[in-house]
């Protein structure tokens, strides 16, 4: 339901050119989970790095360094080529994904503290206190950083950690926000998509999602795609601020906690019904589904003609764009985050605290 209408000049090109870095948990500010990287046809495990507790979030990669937050309270910086530790910093329990912007890395913890660190050394530059747990990754608008928190608030801070604005909703915020063309898009536990002006934090409009959302919305062209806890995937027309189509998994009525990966043709999203679903991006019709052995809270990533997605069944699956399995990799624990892709490598963490790097040996 349209609550307020404002015409938005939103033009996110279909053929976005992605940087080699994977500096945000879905690869880009629009949260589409697509990489233009070239990965080897055959992937081998190049190295493993052990932390002392689970990794629930997605690792990020910048300038050949992997940044991983662990529930052992440390943020780790790991060399992408060798898997050797560059530095680690004791913070708080980390279940959120970090984000890199320029020479800084950012992450929030379970106590509601948000930290900005020097990317090269791990030195803490500043911290900001919220009133609720932080499980979402940050996103950025230039030097400004956007932080969703469980205290029902989205915060916008400047590079010095000073609050520019905040926006409150009627429920906790679990997922990251998308950023596109002067606006940020927030789907939260108030069953509403909020469209906000990036500079002021003022509402530009909202859409009733018919269910709570715990994932990041993805913006592609004039449309936004998001899953809900009510067993739905929605496409929202951003100029009209209305639902264009909606999909419900037909049998087991389970929530979509994962974020969607979106390319020109497909919306690919994992569900707690143990399946990965691929929908026609324009119509929402089912193209195919792929059954894993457990729930799929991890978000898929599209790399060329392949889809990479992890499951609670402790496997990383490689599918083609028709949903046919090309390969699978058995890891040491459940996969809750997205793969990160950079430098010809794919990096992913498990709830046993292991970071895996796959590539050409």
Question: What feature does the model see in each segment?
Answer:
Residues 15-19:
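Sec/Tat signal peptide C-region and signal peptidase I cleavage site
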Residues 1-2:
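N-terminal secretory signal peptides that target proteins for export/translocation
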Residues 5-13:
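Sec-dependent N-terminal signal peptides
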Residues 26-29, 47-60, 70-74, 85-101, ...:
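Extracytoplasmic beta-rich repeat domains
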Residues 79-82, 118-122, 158-162, 197-201, ...:
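Short loop/turn segments that connect beta-strands within beta-propeller blades
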Residues 20-46:
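Blade/loop signatures of beta-propeller domains
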């Amino acid at each position: 339901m349209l609550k307020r209408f404002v015409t938005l000049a939103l033009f996110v090109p279909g053929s976005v050119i992605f940087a080699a870095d994977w500096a945000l948990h879905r690869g880009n500010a629009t949260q589409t989970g697509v990489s233009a990287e070239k990965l080897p046809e055959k992937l081998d495990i190049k190295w493993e790095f052990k932390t002392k507790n689970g990794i629930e979030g997605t690792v990020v990669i910048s300038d050949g360094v992997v940044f991983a937050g662990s529930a052992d309270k440390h943020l780790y910086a790991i060399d992408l080529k060798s898997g050797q530790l560059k530095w680690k910093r004791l913070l708080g329990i980390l279940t959120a994904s970090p984000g890199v912007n320029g020479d800084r890395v950012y992450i929030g913890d379970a106590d509601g503290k948000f930290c900005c660190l020097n990317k090269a050394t791990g030195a803490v530059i500043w911290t900001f206190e919220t009133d609720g747990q932080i499980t979402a990754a940050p996103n950025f608008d230039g030097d400004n950083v956007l932080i969703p928190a469980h205290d029902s608030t989205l915060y916008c801070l400047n590079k010095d950690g000073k609050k520019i604005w905040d926006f409150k909703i009627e429920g906790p915020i679990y997922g990251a926000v998308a950023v596109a063309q002067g606006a940020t898009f927030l789907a939260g536990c108030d069953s509403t998509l909020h469209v906000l002006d990036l500079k002021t934090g003022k509402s530009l409009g909202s859409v009733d999602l018919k269910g709570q959302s715990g994932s990041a919305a993805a913006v592609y062209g004039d449309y936004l795609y998001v899953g809900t806890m009510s067993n739905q995937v929605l496409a929202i027309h951003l100029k009209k601020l209305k639902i264009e189509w909606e999909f419900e998994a037909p049998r087991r009525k389970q929530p979509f906690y994962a974020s969607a990966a979106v390319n020109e043709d497909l919306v690919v999203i994992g569900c707690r019904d143990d399946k990965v679903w691929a929908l026609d991006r324009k119509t929402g019709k089912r193209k195919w589904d792929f059954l894993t052995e457990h729930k799929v809270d991890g978000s898929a990533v599209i790399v060329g003609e392949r889809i990479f997605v992890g499951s609670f069944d402790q496997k990383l699956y490689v599918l083609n764009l028709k949903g046919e399995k090309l390969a699978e990799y058995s890891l040491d624990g459940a996969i809750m985050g997205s793969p990160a892709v950079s430098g010809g490598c794919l990096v992913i963490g498990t709830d046993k605290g292991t970071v895996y790097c796959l590539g050409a040996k």
